């Protein structure tokens, strides 16, 4: 559960309504793979990840980034029940994929950077603070099955 003030919730949902999930999702996942290259080991089936340009232009990275942000969007609609919303994804990433839960925090922080880049002055410190709460809540929910 993420505790947002009404103003924070409004800021998050208003900005999210302007997000191009296809573009931002691919960029966020791509940046994760470039900035934290050890995360690439979970995406060996994606083909060429040999350079930043290869990662950022990889259609499988873009497609999976879109899928990731689709799940994130679903979470924004269920901020009062993030653990329930992400229960199946948590189980998949824990039991089958064996993803280090720290990677969820990294991706959340990368997403915040990408949003700041895309929205500039509109991404005020207050909006960032609200998004930091949300991505921390999502990361915690995704790590739930690890505990």
From Swiss-Prot:
Q: Where does the record place the modification N-acetylvaline?
A: 2
Extract the GO molecular function terms from the UniProt entry: haptoglobin binding; heme binding; hemoglobin alpha binding; metal ion binding; organic acid binding; oxygen binding; oxygen carrier activity; peroxidase activity
Q: Where does heme b bind?
A: 64, 93
Q: Reply yes or no: does the keyword Transmembrane apply.
A: no
Q: In which tissues is it expressed?
A: Red blood cells.
Q: Which SUPFAM superfamilies match?
A: Globin-like (SSF46458)
PTM-bearing positions, type Phosphoserine: 45
Q: Which family does it belong to?
A: Belongs to the globin family.
Q: What is this protein called?
A: Hemoglobin subunit beta
This protein's species is: Macaca fascicularis
Q: Write the gene name.
A: HBB
